[in-house]
Structure formats: structure tokens, C-alpha cells
Amino acid sequence: MLIIETLPLLRQQIRRWRQEGKRIALVPTMGNLHEGHMTLVDEAKTRADVVVVTIFVNPLQFERPDDLAHYPRTLQEDCEKLTRHGADLVFAPAAADIYPAGLEKQTYVDVPALSTILEGASRPGHFRGVSTIVSKLFNLIQPDVACFGEKDYQQLALIRKMVADMGYDINIVGVPTVRAKDGLALSSRNGYLTEEERQIAPQLSKIMWALAEKMALGERQIDALLEDAAAQLLRAGFTPDELFIRDAETLQPLTVDSQQAVILMAAWLGKARLIDNQLVDLRH
């Protein structure tokens, strides 16, 4: 497996693969990899000849400098895991290479229809940072396919819209959320949980699934459902952050024409902000 840190070497390798007619898959990450990331790599391997994994802690995605400073950097361990799963290249650039003009003078890519609603409303600039770095990586690596986890539902929707609007010829693949045996969605931030908090954490998904079941049975009092879920989270020990029920396709409020809903949940447990989502078929 190749490990490349500079743009010239990356471009040279991508050019070589293109000349050889190789189909390229991309898995963008911020490192601190877990089994959920490995599932993305495994999926990518089924869809391309070579798999590029990027490891870059993107400063544009962090609102708080302390959060950026404390984000785990585990490049050596990450590369060992990726070698075992058959990745072909790890691109791990420095921020100065990705943003040579500095963050203040950086040219941004924004998807305003999705970047400022829901989670974006409380995290200004976050999704603009996501779309900017993903666009840069698409331009640098020129993948045929790119794999993203469905756990970050709004992020995946934003990337799909960016690809459609910007005319990228890239197949975006959403990969189902990987969970621990007790139902907790795998996340790099789970490492912030204490032992006691880790025992509580699966309640987030259980409360979400109970809400989804009520909706599947025909309950449509959205405000009441969300208030009940928030109360359950508080009783379990969480601090609710974001609770939404939206049209799964548009991320707008449900209408009589909505065929599928998505429940979007985010809650703090200690120092960890946990997120999850669940689709609900409304056609019954």
C-alpha cells in the first residue's frame, strides 16, 4: 500500500493509474478509523480496481479550535488497518498543502440548499467545509466512485446534490451504518465516552427505533413525537442537540406527498456528540 503526503506524488500516481485504465474508488476520512470505515473500504474494493483512502482532519469542519486540536490523530494505526483491508493508496496531506492560501482566503464550495438547515443551522460553516474538501479531493483524485457512510445522512445528501449540481461524473455510494452488537452506531467520537457512558449510549438508537415504529404504525403528530423522544433522551442521561423528522429526499418538513421520512438525531453524552438516523416508509 502506498502512503503519499504531497500533491505532486498523488497526481503522478493517479495519472499512472488512469493511463493503465484503472477504475478508481475514493473513501474520504478524517482518520481515527474503525470498523465502519473498513466497511467503506470493503465496499469500494467491490466497485473499482484501486481504492484511495484520504486521511485529513479538515479544519474547515470544526467550529471550535479545541475540538480540532483534540481530534485523535492515529495515522500509523489507520494505515495498518487499511493495509489489512487491501487499500491501495493512503493520501495524508498537511493542511498547508490543501489550503495553501490559508483558511481565511480559501475559495469555498457551498450547497446552500442543504448546508444551512437542520444540523447546518447550529453548526455554521461546517457543511461548507465538508463540500469544499470533498470537491477538492474529487478534483485531485478524479474517482469513478466514492463511498460515504449513511450515518452522516445530511452530509451524504449534500454531497449527492453537489455532485449533481457541479456535473461531477462520479458514482456516490451510500454504505449502511455499522453498529456495535448493542446497536450503537460506530463513530470515532465513541472513544470520548467513559465506561458508564458507553453503557448508556445505545439508548439513543433504541429511542430512535421506537419513534420509527410509531411512525410506521401511522403516528404523524411530529411535534409530540419529537418532544417525547427528547424527554426519553433526557431521562436516559443525554443532552438532546438535534431532533428532526423530515422528508428523506428533500430534508424539508413532511408533506402529504412524502413517501419516506428520515429521523435525524444528535445528542451529547459527556464529551461525545452522538448522531444517528433512521428511514421510515410512509406509504403504508
From Swiss-Prot:
CDD domains associated with the record: PanC
Keyword Translocase: no
Pathway(s) per entry: Cofactor biosynthesis; (R)-pantothenate biosynthesis; (R)-pantothenate from (R)-pantoate and beta-alanine: step 1/1
Residues at the active site: H37
Pfam family for this entry, one: Pantoate_ligase
EC nos: 6.3.2.1
Binding site for (R)-pantoate: Q61, Q155
GO CC field: cytosol
GO MF assignments: ATP binding; pantoate-beta-alanine ligase activity
GO annotation, biological process: pantothenate biosynthetic process
Note: The reaction proceeds by a bi uni uni bi ping pong mechanism.
Subunit annotation: Homodimer.
Functional note: Catalyzes the condensation of pantoate with beta-alanine in an ATP-dependent reaction via a pantoyl-adenylate intermediate.
Descriptive protein name: Pantothenate synthetase
Organism taxonomic ancestry: Bacteria, Pseudomonadati, Pseudomonadota, Gammaproteobacteria, Enterobacterales
